[in-house]
């Protein structure tokens, strides 16, 4: 019970945060992840002290205990339409009844208390899809801005060039929700080299499936990973869950490499089908095979697609662009907080 109360509202964290805010006197507080240790207590402290607060929505935990709307191999949106208590009996959080109950309690408590309507000045969603999901859950539309993630340009001193080797790349956690099984199933019928970079619970399955056309590289450092991505014909992102963003997508764009991704969630708003990549039906190895074969047989068009992907990165996902949007959100939050009453 003590753990449940701490996740819903941590008195220890609230005292520490209040002390730090009083010491530092910030113009604004920007909260990224509060779960599980800080708890939404941070928003109440900021409200009490009259400090504007911005919160970035990095996942869906605040409206669905699964954090991804993914359960037992499929998308599950019940938490948008009803309470989250159903998740407790399904062990959606770390396969634990108690853990799932605690997270569901947090979701329902702050829904009841109106925390998200009354204690936060501005929210940042990473994509339009993510913003719409929060609005569907009843969050205030007028308070949610869109600001994507960004990465430093990994190749400022090098130009995008024609790929010399022919291969595809998967980079990510090796788990069910990332679509790893779909990828492996598709590659049984694809004669084209694929390099798999990552680690996770399905690692043994992936390593055992390695063959002439499928190479498991395990975990790689960032520089090596980006080099593999830069030289690839395409990157594959076969996720089965709703992701608020796809960092690997903008990494691929920065490398001048197009993306083949599931036609699902935020990916649809990040990838322009046929322009910066291709979209396939989620969970369908047949659809994925079709898109890979198109890439294999149209390498000149794939190169042009990569140039457009690189342009997309420069237009939307650079630190400079991110800074401008962030400052705009901060200014809004400060302005809107000036006249508020608590």
Language model feature labels by segment:
Residues 62, 75-76, 80-156, 216:
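Donor nucleotide-sugar binding/catalytic pocket of nucleotide-sugar-dependent glycosyltransferases
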Residues 122-124, 160-178, 182-189:
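Conserved donor-binding/catalytic core segment of Leloir-type glycosyltransferases
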Residues 273-274, 278-285, 292-299:
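Conserved acidic donor-binding segment of nucleotide-sugar-dependent glycosyltransferases
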């Amino acid at each position: 019970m003590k753990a449940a109360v701490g996740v819903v509202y941590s008195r220890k964290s609230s005292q520490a945060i209040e002390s730090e805010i009083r010491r530092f006197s910030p113009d604004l507080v920007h909260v990224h992840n509060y779960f599980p240790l800080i708890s939404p207590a941070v928003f109440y402290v900021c409200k009490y002290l009259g400090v504007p607060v911005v919160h970035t929505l990095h996942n869906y935990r605040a409206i669905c205990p699964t954090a991804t709307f993914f359960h037992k191999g499929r998308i599950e949106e019940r938490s948008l339409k009803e309470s989250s208590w159903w998740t407790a009996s399904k062990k959606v959080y770390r396969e634990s009844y108690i853990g799932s109950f605690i997270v569901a309690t947090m979701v329902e408590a702050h829904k009841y208390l109106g925390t998200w309507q009354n204690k936060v000045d501005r929210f940042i969603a990473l994509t339009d899809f993510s913003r719409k999901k929060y609005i569907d859950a009843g969050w205030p539309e007028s308070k949610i801005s869109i600001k994507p993630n960004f990465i430093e340009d990994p190749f400022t001193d090098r130009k995008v060039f024609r790929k010399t080797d022919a291969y595809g790349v998967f980079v990510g956690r090796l788990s069910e929700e990332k679509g790893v099984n779909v990828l492996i199933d598709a590659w049984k019928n694809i004669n084209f080299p694929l390099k798999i970079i990552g680690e996770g619970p399905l690692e043994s399955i992936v390593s055992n499936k390695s063959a002439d056309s499928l190479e498991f590289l395990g975990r790689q450092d960032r520089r090596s990973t980006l080099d593999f991505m830069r030289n690839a014909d395409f990157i594959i992102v076969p996720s089965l869950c709703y992701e608020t963003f796809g960092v690997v997508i903008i990494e691929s764009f920065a490398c001048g490499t197009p993306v083949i991704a599931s036609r699902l969630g935020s990916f649809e708003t990040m990838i322009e089908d046929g322009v910066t990549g291709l979209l396939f039906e989620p969970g369908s190895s047949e659809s994925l095979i079709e898109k890979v074969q198109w890439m294999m047989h149209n390498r000149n068009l794939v190169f042009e697609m990569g140039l457009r992907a690189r342009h997309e990165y420069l237009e939307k996902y650079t630190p400079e662009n991110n800074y401008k949007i962030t400052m705009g959100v901060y200014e809004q939050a400060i302005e809107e907080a000036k006249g508020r009453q608590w």
